[in-house]
UniProtKB/Swiss-Prot annotation:
Residues 1-445 form the Biotin carboxylation domain. Its cofactor is Mg(2+); Mn(2+); Co(2+). This is Pyruvate carboxylase subunit A. Keywords: ATP-binding, Gluconeogenesis, Ligase, Magnesium, Metal-binding, Multifunctional enzyme, Nucleotide-binding, Pyruvate. One of its GO terms (molecular function) is ATP binding. ATP binds at K116, E200, H235. Optimum temperature is 80-90 degrees Celsius. SMART domains: Biotin_carb_C. It catalyses: hydrogencarbonate + pyruvate + ATP = oxaloacetate + ADP + phosphate + H(+). Transmembrane segments: none annotated. The gene is pycA. Pfam families: Biotin_carb_C, Biotin_carb_N, CPSase_L_D2. Pyruvate carboxylase catalyzes a 2-step reaction, involving the ATP-dependent carboxylation of the covalently attached biotin in the first step and the transfer of the carboxyl group to pyruvate in the second. The active site is at R291.
Amino acid sequence: MFNKVLIANRGEIAIRIIRACWELGIKTVAVYSEADKRSLHATLADEAYCIGPAPAAKSYLNIDAILNVAEKAKVDAIHPGYGFLAENAEFARAVKKAGFEFIGPNPDAIEAMGSKINAKKIMKKAGVPLIPGSEGAIEDIDEAIEIAEAIGFPVVVKASAGGGGMGMSVAYSKEELKEVIESARNIAKSAFGDPTVFIEKYLENPRHIEIQLLGDKHGNIIHLGDRECSIQRRHQKLIEEAPSPIMTEELRERMGEAAIKAGKAINYDSAGTVEFLYENGNFYFLEMNTRIQVEHTVTEQVTGIDLVKAMIKIAAGEELTLKQEDVKIRGHAIECRINAEDPLNDFVPCPGKIKLYRSPGGPGVRIDSGVYGGAEIPPYYDSMIAKLITYGNSREEAIARMKRALREYVIIGVKTNIPFHRAVLEEENFLKGNISTHYVEQNMHKLREKMVKYALESRDLYSVVSEKVFEKNKKIAAAVGGLTMYISQIMKENEVNNKEW
């Protein structure tokens, strides 16, 4: 087992990894940017080093700076968390070349899934179901029109190197297709440095369901069940749950088998996720995330398996002790991503200082957070404040606990999307499990009224707290003022006494 691990990340995931390391008896090293010098992860770790200015390109994406700290701190391994360098094959190779273990999959697996076109070719060969579309890059508009007419409009044009919905556009006719392809290429070139695009059949109302994998360096690979991730905004997940409300044992077995085929096709040897789109009884490969997912928490809650500790053990060379038949799904878990953003203003990010912070608790409540009262939410990174997770014996109990926990949650100083989550958890379609990746835009008109109500509750709470703080501060100010006058008088008397002496 490792003696010391560097965490090349920030926020809640850095703290999650620190906790896993401590439970395994491993010392931790944090890295932080100048904007994060007072961050919780930097304070919590056994050692912490500044790696550069606030912009991620000069700090959390600075491979040389991270490796210099790893060498200085004499670590054994590096965990990338998610985001930043987590799915960068060159970083994984650089870590190994420098003599450290990379706590994640082998670089070849990362690289294989980094290109969507390449990933589709691998999945087709492995027998994993694919969305109908082009087999490779689109070279010219005539070819694109021919493919689109063969599979039927609407079609979606995607960037091969893309992620998070960037470089993705829908065309409903051949007249639209040319413009959409040009736009997608320009966005892909600007965002990813690669203008390559491809075409797929556009699924009108799919669900986003993913399968959690766990593989080791000895050829073993298992799946840990499914997660429902359909509640999204601009292809960014907001609410996740395990298992999916529509999941059956038969469907889970089929999707699990497909995910394992995907993992085996690239010799996968860590925690990873195979994402599928599901519609009308069929599921199709979307992409594979070669890292720990933000939403790994709900899988941990329903399986009892610590995924971060498993990643560390696998990287240290340990063999999986679990067999597929050992994995049991018990109960239901839901995760709400608590972000510093305004859901009533198109979810615009709201960086700033948290003036008061009180997290919820009670039965079945877990919170993975990287903040505290007085902490700054900087504008340079993702706006996520925390992940709120609830667990219950049933979906209904998990929802009831989440509603309670959201009601208890107090964050004052920055706007958050808590009103959005509270509104969703009362909406009829969500409660029935009738959701898709278009849920937010399809139901926003219904959600808005309740979001306003809950936002006003937050504002009223802020007013009450501010008034109490003001009254308290007035008393403190008066006490300090009196003490200052007293000290000043003593100092004057001392000056007189000293002079006389």
